[in-house]
Amino acid sequence: MLYGKENRDEAEFLEPIFGSESEQVDLPKYKLAQQSIEPRVAYQLVQDEMLDEGNARLNLATFCQTYMEPEAVKLMSQTLEKNAIDKSEYPRTTEIENRCVNMIADLWNASEKEKFMGTSTIGSSEACMLGGMAMKFSWRKRAEKLGLDINAKKPNLVISSGYQVCWEKFCVYWDIEMREVPMDREHMSINLEKVMDYVDEYTIGVVGIMGITYTGRYDDIKALDNLIEEYNKQTDYKVYIHVDAASGGLYAPFVEPELEWDFRLKNVISINTSGHKYGLVYPGVGWVLWRDKKYLPEELIFKVSYLGGELPTMAINFSHSASQLIGQYYNFVRYGFDGYKAIHERTHKVAMYLAEEIEKTGMFEIMNDGAQLPIVCYKLKENSNRGWNLYDLADRLLMKGWQVPAYPLPKNLENEIIQRLVIRADFGMNMAFNYVQDMQEAIDALNKAHILFHQEPENKTYGFTH
């Protein structure tokens, strides 16, 4: 049979690429569309909007978990509609939250002689807010009892300049003076020689960080506890420690169980962590615990109806899905202590390997080698003979899909530009091999390229939001 040319214009108009004329309508962007469209078309249109987004697995900027097992995802998808705040309607979900709090308290060595308290949150930012509020209210009670004029000065919070931004928000929201202990090259975590200089009778508490966002290093919480203990012996205006363990809280107990940073220390009264970081759950879930209920002021606790009675709650957020709680409990049941330990130790090995390979290039100074948290940080050596900087390297790596942040360190070190690799449980050794190869190719390309490089007079942050 012979075929001739046909006019396809009309046929193409009547046969949209998704088999539906509704696809021909512009995708609503800033105003709600007038008409409905087919669900499969809506799905495809929205999915297409995200085609050029980065691959989360290759995002080495984020601490957040980017992979969970299909069984976990199935459980979580089956509980998306459950509102975790509805305690009486979903008593088993409430019990699961309670079990998670108890398991975490055990990991953090809560004493059987004390009555610990804890709650879930939607992340460590909310958990830090709760921990901070408890410190402020407790300080106010102690100060009033001792006759201190609480209106004479603004209360203050002492913390390393490597703090996570939620602490700045806390201080702004609740009118607290943030006293930052500066970092320097010799003190890449809280400076124990200077920290007590920032403490006075108006200090609501000192925050120790288990995993500084910029570098991944731990503050020496035990040494800080010793300093606080000596201070408290000499004054009636007691000061206590809140540990921001957003990253390290569900990592250190498995990898360094002998490290004393938790409720084993006398002056550590509260701790927060993120379940969606090294707790291995998708965002967002966090946890905050107090070593004893006396450190959690009653006025911060509210009562909700529960099985004909009342249940205490203190979360800032109200309605939120129970799915992340279910995901956390699944992981605790699935992995157990040994499973978490094995996963985190493998992640630790990957981080150490990457630090070694990056150092072998001879171009970088390792700022953090992943010996504690599996975070690798490095800067260009000052004497390295090159015409490019870390922002250029970040651009080049992005061409391969790798999202690697480059940013300045906090004040007092703001001229130090570093890159940071956050190694997560889903970043295996094979991916590490690929990264090393792609990084070397990127360096070779930059060394040979004849292009205009970044020459900004001011430092900037590239792909990094802490």
Curated annotation (Swiss-Prot):
BP terms from Gene Ontology: glutamate catabolic process
SUPFAM superfamilies per UniProt: PLP-dependent transferases (SSF53383)
Enzyme Commission code(s) on record: 4.1.1.15
InterPro entries: Glutamate_decarboxylase, PyrdxlP-dep_de-COase, PyrdxlP-dep_Trfase, PyrdxlP-dep_Trfase_major
Keyword match Transcription: no
Enzyme superclass (EC): lyase
Chain positions found as N6-(pyridoxal phosphate)lysine: 277
SS bond list: none
Induction: Expression is highest at onset of stationary phase in presence of NaCl and glutamate, and at low pH. Chloride-dependent expression is activated by GadR.
Cofactor(s) this protein requires: pyridoxal 5'-phosphate
Reaction(s) catalysed (UniProt annotation): L-glutamate + H(+) = 4-aminobutanoate + CO2
Keywords tagged on the record: Decarboxylase, Lyase, Pyridoxal phosphate
A Gene Ontology cellular-component term: cytosol
GO molecular function: aromatic-L-amino-acid decarboxylase activity; glutamate decarboxylase activity; pyridoxal phosphate binding
Keyword Lyase in record: yes
Family recorded in the similarity comment: Belongs to the group II decarboxylase family.
Function of the molecule: Converts internalized glutamate to GABA and increases the internal pH. Involved in glutamate-dependent acid resistance.
Family annotation (NCBIfam families): Glu-decarb-GAD
Name of the protein this chain belongs to: Glutamate decarboxylase
Protein source organism: Lactococcus lactis subsp. cremoris (strain MG1363)
